[in-house]
């Protein structure tokens, strides 16, 4: 049996594919339904907004690697996880987004590198 996701993990699972402001209403509907069906707690707009700000910040940092001080440069012909200072990114986002639990930041940063940079 798979581990049960936390509230913030479920929110990030929906928001990670929200790329345009027009998708916000769809994401909100999905979030309300998922949180209700999985009995993770009531919909909390303040938490959702904090996680959304974190997600957009991560996406912006990884989406423009040339401008990022955490992008260490390509070491080979292809993009790789080693092109990033993952620990530095984690520390940066932990200090910048204290409302988002540190454990959630720790797992999401490498996933975001895969999702927004490697794919």
Where are these regions (language model features)?
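Charged, amphipathic alpha-helical regulatory modules used
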Residues: 1-119
